[in-house]
Amino acid sequence: MGELRIGKVEKYIHEKLEKKKLHFVLIDPDDTSPEVAGKLARVCEELGVDAIMVGGSTGAEGEVLDNVVRSIKDNSSLPVILFPGSHGGISRYADAIFFMSLLNSRNPFFITGAQALGAFTVKKFGIEPIPMAYIVVEPGETVGWVGDARPIPRHKPKLAAAYALAGQYLGMRLVYLEAGSGAPEPVPEEMVRVVKSVIDVPLIVGGGIKSGEQAKKLIKSGADIIVTGTAIEKAKSLEEARKRLEAIRNGVFV
């Protein structure tokens, strides 16, 4: 029987987590040109961001996605991890893919359907799959709507913890709590605390994180990896993006 090996990017994540908490930046190819993505990647690397995720809930694919991934790879040495909205969000140029299941979706397509449709493409391209439990928390924003999720109520941390633990027991090696891109508030600290207290795998928290202070509180509550996207994309200039990134990074690396 073939041995199940942990890939290079996942190993990189675990090794870094032994020393510090991590900061990933999410770039949405729908909203970011290849040129801007390349410049952002350079800034990310200079500021000590740990990886770049590429994807979005409305699902850029094909050439649009490829060009953004290639531009990031040309401008930085950071790992590029796909964060697909559906089975079309796969690029042969990426290093890894969060092979994720939206556990609290009402629609089986987002739990296992899209995954089955994308599996052979991941294998054919030789992209490293990283199994991840994806849990959408209120308000959920676009991803909650597109993914037909029943967002976890903000005042029900045990519900999120039950899903997270189920994900771990199903063999997923990361848990991601998502408040939704551009959410007015991040995932509640209490929810992060409760989820972290029951799982043994790294916890990623994303959505609505706009300041270093918010990042710091989430890290203190138990988040291992913070993901920011919209906060950077909404910046009017590269200089402003750099300032925002720096502020968030300082919150993560407390």
Curated annotation (Swiss-Prot):
Requisite cofactors: Mg(2+)
Read off the Pfam families from this record.
PcrB (PF01884)
**Binding, Mg(2+):** D28, S57
Instruction: Please give the CDD domains that the UniProt record associates with this protein.
Output: PcrB_like (cd02812)
InterPro entries (UniProt xref): GGGP/HepGP_synthase_sf, GGGP_HepGP_synthase, GGGP_synth, IGPS_HisA/HisF
Q: For this UniProt record, give its keywords in alphabetical order, as a comma-separated list.
A: Cytoplasm, Lipid biosynthesis, Lipid metabolism, Magnesium, Metal-binding, Phospholipid biosynthesis, Phospholipid metabolism, Transferase
Known EC number: 2.5.1.41
Query: What is this enzyme's class at the first EC digit?
Result: transferase
Major subcellular location class = cytoplasm
Kindly state which reaction or reactions the protein catalyses. Answer: sn-glycerol 1-phosphate + (2E,6E,10E)-geranylgeranyl diphosphate = sn-3-O-(geranylgeranyl)glycerol 1-phosphate + diphosphate
GO molecular function list = imidazoleglycerol-phosphate synthase activity; magnesium ion binding; phosphoglycerol geranylgeranyltransferase activity
NCBIfam families per the UniProt record, alphabetical: GGGP, GGGP-family, PRK04169.1-2
The role this protein plays is: Prenyltransferase that catalyzes the transfer of the geranylgeranyl moiety of geranylgeranyl diphosphate (GGPP) to the C3 hydroxyl of sn-glycerol-1-phosphate (G1P). This reaction is the first ether-bond-formation step in the biosynthesis of archaeal membrane lipids.
Similarity-based family: Belongs to the GGGP/HepGP synthase family. Group II subfamily.
Name of the molecule in the record:
Geranylgeranylglyceryl phosphate synthase
Q: Which organism does this sequence originate in?
A: Pyrococcus horikoshii (strain ATCC 700860 / DSM 12428 / JCM 9974 / NBRC 100139 / OT-3)
Traced from the root, the source organism's taxonomic lineage reads: Archaea, Methanobacteriati, Methanobacteriota, Thermococci, Thermococcales
